[in-house]
C-alpha cells in the first residue's frame, strides 16, 4: 500500500508547488538547503547516532532539554535534530548546539534511504507523533530503533489517521515505543495499531522546559522601561492573524486607565512581522519595534513589536499578564507553559484544542483565565493590572502547577536507554519493550 501513499504524496507536493514557489520568492527558505529535503546530507562521523525529529519551533523547544540530557548520558553518540520549518531551524541552530540541525527529508523511498545512509542512526526519536510511513519503514529496515516521544494525537489527527489505518497498521505495530503525554493519547495510539506493550504515558516534555533567561536583553529592557516610565507590561505571545486587531482594540481602552502600560506584541511567524507593523502604523497607537530599539526606544502607553526570534520566553519574566496567541483565532492555541515558568498570569481564548488537557488543568487550578471575546479580554487584563493579589496568586498557581508536572524527560531517558544498549533491530524485527 505504500506505493499508493507515495503517489498521493507526490500529487500533494505537486499541487502545493506554486504556493511554495510564491513563498520562496519572498523568503528563499524553501529552496535554500533544499537538497536536505531530498536526503542529501554529509555523512555523519561516528557510529550509533541518535536522530531526533521535531516539526516546528514548539516541538524543537520541547525536546531541547531531552537532547541535552542525551548528550550527557551518551557522550560517544552523535546527535542530530531534523526539523520541517525554517523558523524551527533558525531557533534550533541558535539554542540546541549539542545537535547538528537539518531539514527532514521528504517521505519518499529515495530521499529517506539517502538520509538514513548518511546518518546511520541507532535510535530515532520523533516528537509528538508525526507519522511518516515511508520513513518509519526505512528506518526500521536500516536497523534503527524508532520511538515516538512526547506523543500527542489530537482528535482531528486521530480522525484523519483512522482513515488510513490499514496502510499504517503494519508499520506502526513495529515501532519500538510510544511515549505519550496522556492516557487519551495512549489509547488512540493503541487504536491505530501500536503494540500495547510498547505504549506508555510519560507526561509532557514541555513541562520540563528551561527557557533562556537572556539577562542581557532584560537589562536592556529594564533600562528602557525606567526611561519611558513603564509601570505594567502585557505580553501577547505567538499571535496569529486576526488577533492583533483584537489586542490593539483592548489595549486602546486599557491605556486610558493605565497610561504607563506597555503591550509587547510577538507574532507567531516571522513572515507576519511586516503586516503587523503596518497594522500598528495605522492603529494610531504609539509603537516601536525590537529591531530598532536603540533608535526608537520603548514608549509607555504604547506597543512594542517583537520582530525577532528566540526572545519571547524571557520577556514573560517582566509580564504582569500573558496572552497566549492562536486561541482567539481558531488555531488551537500555543505554548502556555513558558509564561507559567516565569509565574506570569496566563490568559487565552476559547480555541485551545492543541493544549486542551493542559488548559483545563490550568483553569481548574485558577492559574489561567479563558476569554471568549475582545471585551472579555479587556476585562480580565484590567483586573490583572489593577488587582495585585489576583495577579500574584494566578502567577504563583501557574508556576506551582508546572513544577508538579515535571519528570517526563527522565521517564523518556529510562525507556530509551535499554534500546541503545540492545543490538540493532535488523530488518523490520520488532524489539522487545524495555522492562519496567
Which residues does each PLM region occupy?
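Nucleotide-activated sugar donor-binding and catalytic core shared by glycosyltransferases
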Residues: 1-436
Amino acid at each position: 500500500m505504500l506505493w499508493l501513499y507515495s503517489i498521493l504524496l507526490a500529487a500533494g507536493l505537486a499541487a502545493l508547488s506554486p504556493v511554495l514557489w510564491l513563498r520562496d520568492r519572498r523568503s528563499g527558505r524553501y529552496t535554500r538547503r533544499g537538497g536536505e529535503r531530498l536526503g542529501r546530507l554529509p555523512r555523519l562521523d561516528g557510529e550509533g547516532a541518535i536522530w531526533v525529529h521535531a516539526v516546528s519551533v514548539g516541538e524543537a523547544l520541547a525536546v531541547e532539554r531531552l537532547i541535552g540530557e542525551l548528550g550527557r548520558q551518551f557522550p560517544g553518540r552523535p546527535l542530530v535534530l531534523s526539523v520541517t520549518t525554517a523558523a524551527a531551524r533558525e531557533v534550533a541552530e541558535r539554542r540546541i548546539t549539542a545537535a547538528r540541525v537539518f531539514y527532514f527529508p521528504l517521505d519518499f523511498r529515495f530521499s529517506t534511504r539517502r538520509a538514513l545512509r548518511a546518518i546511520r542512526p541507532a535510535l530515532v526519536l520523533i516528537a509528538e507523533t508525526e507519522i511518516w510511513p515511508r520513513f518509519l519503514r526505512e528506518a526500521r529496515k536500516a536497523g534503527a530503533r524508532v520511538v515516538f516521544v512526547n506523543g500527542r494525537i489530537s482528535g482531528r489527527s486521530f480522525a484523519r489517521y483512522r482513515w488510513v489505518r490499514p496502510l499504517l497498521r503494519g508499520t506502526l505495530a513495529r515501532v519500538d515505543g510510544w511515549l505519550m503525554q496522556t492516557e487519551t493519547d495512549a489509547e488512540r495510539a493503541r487504536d491505530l495499531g501500536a503494540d500495547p506493550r510498547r505504549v506508555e504515558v510519560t507526561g509532557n516534555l514541555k513541562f520540563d522546559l528551561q527557557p533562556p533567561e537572556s539577562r542581557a536583553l532584560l537589562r536592556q529592557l529594564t533600562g528602557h522601561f525606567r526611561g519611558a516610565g513603564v509601570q505594567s507590561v502585557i505580553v501577547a505571545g505567538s499571535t496569529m492573524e486576526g488577533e492583533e486587531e483584537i489586542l490593539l482594540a483592548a489595549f486602546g481602552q486599557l491605556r486610558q486607565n493605565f497610561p504607563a502600560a506597555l503591550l509587547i506584541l510577538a507574532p507567531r511567524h516571522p513572515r507576519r512581522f511586516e503586516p503587523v507593523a503596518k497594522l500598528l502604523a495605522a492603529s494610531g497607537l504609539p509603537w516601536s519595534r525590537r529591531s530598532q530599539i536603540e533608535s526608537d526606544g520603548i514608549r509607555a502607553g504604547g506597543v512594542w513589536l517583537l520582530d525577532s526570534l528566540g526572545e519571547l520566553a524571557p520577556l514573560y519574566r517582566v509580564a504582569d499578564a500573558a496572552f497566549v496567541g492562536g486561541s482567539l483565532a481558531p488555531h488551537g492555541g500555543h505554548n502556555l507553559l513558558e509564561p507559567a515558568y516565569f509565574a506570569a498570569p496566563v490568559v487565552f481564548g476559547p480555541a485551545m484544542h492543541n493544549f486542551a488537557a493542559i488548559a483545563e488543568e490550568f483553569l481548574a487550578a485558577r492559574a489561567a483565565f479563558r476569554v471568549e471575546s475582545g471585551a472579555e479580554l479587556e476585562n480580565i487584563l484590567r483586573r490583572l493590572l489593577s488587582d495585585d493579589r489576583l495577579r500574584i496568586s494566578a502567577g504563583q498557581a501557574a508556576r506551582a502547577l508546572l513544577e508538579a508536572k515535571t519528570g517526563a524527560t527522565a521517564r523518556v531517558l529510562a525507556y530509551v536507554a535499554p534500546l541503545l544498549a540492545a543490538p540493532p533491530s535488523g530488518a523490520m524485527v520488532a524489539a522487545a519493550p524495555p522492562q519496567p
